[in-house]
């Protein structure tokens, strides 16, 4: 008989219960026992489905990705350690030296810096276009174009891409169309329904929804099977692995996604209407407003009444007034990120888009004094009162 020390390491695990748990289990294992050498070889080559090593695949992360896949109406999904891990793996999987990618100026700051920094050093060129105008995209596509990239709603301008129109252009050109749908989520808009090939999320935001877990996910339809295979291989090579505890928390957040997003969107629209009528406010960016670039697109593409849970408020008085308003907030905390249960506030020109110069900010639709307000689940009246008292400080009568 083996020694007690050895027995402590080799005691068989109990079998999984026959009863089904309504809560997904968490598997912390980094490695998995196999039947024989051929079994492991088949797992690593992809000839056989299963698990071998946690950097390759993990059942807890896969369960989360599969849930997002179903919400998006996709056929394939891959989990990642963060939204930027998902974005960078997608771009590096599809782009090589000499290739071009078509993208809008209104991009998340780190996506823009990835395109103009790392990918530029690798020999990839960005061709800028207006993704709300399919003709602009068509004019930007060349024989070297290997990817068209967009955001469903841009951070923080809330500009939208014409998903069906651009998808049609990409289909004719034979170019993959990928969108970052972080700001919308499948509780508001499902890009695959509009002809998009790949949908990317920072799951840290609305999918998780509680500001306590970091992750990302890429979803593709059946026609994108080969693209998803390349993205998975790049994830394995780069190591952007979603940890099991993070995957569990993100998966749990999906259960309340529809409730949270519906409430936050309704509150954001209410705040946008009230602030747009305030004489102390120069501009409010929110697709529910008739004056916003994305108003018609939002009504055509989004679920009814769900036109975004983020608004940007620019008080009269420029950058100084914006910062004064931000510092005067009492209920709403200053913090980065979005999509959680708490309403937050930040100054994009000095945070998420700090790497852009004045011209770059203007092209991205960001005003120097703009304050981004990702709306949470607080009562609208309480949020409005805080914003109005902060406006009174920033723009005195």
Where are these regions (language model features)?
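N-terminal glycine-rich, Lys/His-bearing helix-loop that initiates the first secondary-structure elements
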Residues: 1-48, 396-397
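Conserved PLP-enzyme active-site core in the AAT-like
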Residues: 14-17, 76-280, 285
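Conserved N-terminal alpha-helix of the aminotransferase class I/II PLP-enzyme fold
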Residues: 31-88, 110-117
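Short, acidic Gly/Pro/Ser/Thr-rich loop/turn segments
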Residues: 33-37, 225-226, 257, 318-321, ...
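Short amphipathic alpha-helical segments
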Residues: 49, 75, 214, 246, ...
């Amino acid at each position: 008989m083996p020694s007690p020390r050895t027995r402590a390491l080799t005691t068989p695990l109990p079998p999984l219960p026959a009863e089904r748990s309504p809560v997904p289990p968490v598997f912390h294992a980094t490695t998995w026992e196999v039947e024989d050498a051929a079994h492991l070889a088949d797992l690593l080559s992809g000839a056989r489905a299963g698990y071998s090593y946690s950097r390759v695949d993990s059942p807890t992360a896969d369960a989360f990705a599969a849930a997002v896949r179903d919400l998006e109406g996709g056929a394939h999904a891959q989990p990642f350690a963060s939204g930027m891990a998902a974005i960078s793996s997608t771009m590096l999987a599809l782009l090589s030296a000499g290739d071009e990618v078509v993208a809008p100026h209104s991009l998340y700051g780190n996506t823009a810096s990835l395109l103009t920094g790392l990918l530029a050093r690798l020999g990839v060129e960005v061709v800028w276009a207006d993704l709300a105008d399919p003709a602009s995209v068509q004019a930007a596509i060349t024989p070297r174009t290997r990817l068209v990239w967009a955001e469903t709603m841009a951070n923080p301008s809330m500009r939208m891409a014409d998903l069906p129109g651009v998808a049609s252009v990409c289909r004719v050109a034979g170019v993959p169309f990928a969108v970052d749908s972080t700001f919308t989520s499948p509780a508001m808009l499902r890009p695959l329904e509009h002809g998009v090939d790949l949908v990317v999320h920072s799951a840290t935001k609305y999918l998780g929804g509680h500001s306590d877990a970091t992750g990302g996910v890429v979803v593709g339809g059946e026609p994108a099977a080969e693209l998803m295979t390349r993205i998975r291989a790049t994830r394995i090579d780069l190591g952007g692995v979603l940890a099991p505890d993070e995957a569990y928390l993100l998966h749990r957040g999906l259960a309340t996604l529809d409730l949270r997003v519906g409430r936050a969107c309704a509150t954001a629209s209410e705040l946008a209407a009230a602030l747009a009528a305030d004489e102390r406010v120069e501009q409010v960016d929110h697709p529910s407003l008739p004056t916003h670039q994305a108003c018609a697109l939002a009504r055509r593409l989004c679920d009814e009444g769900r036109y975004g849970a983020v608004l940007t408020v620019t008080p009269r008085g420029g950058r100084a007034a914006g910062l004064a308003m931000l510092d005067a907030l009492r209920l709403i905390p200053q913090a980065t990120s979005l999509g959680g249960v708490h309403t937050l506030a930040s100054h994009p020109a000095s945070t998420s888009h700090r790497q852009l110069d004045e011209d770059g900010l203007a092209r991205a639709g960001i005003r120097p004094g703009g304050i981004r307000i990702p709306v949470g689940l607080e009562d609208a009246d309480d949020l409005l009162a805080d914003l109005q008292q902060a406006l009174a400080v920033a723009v005195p009568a």
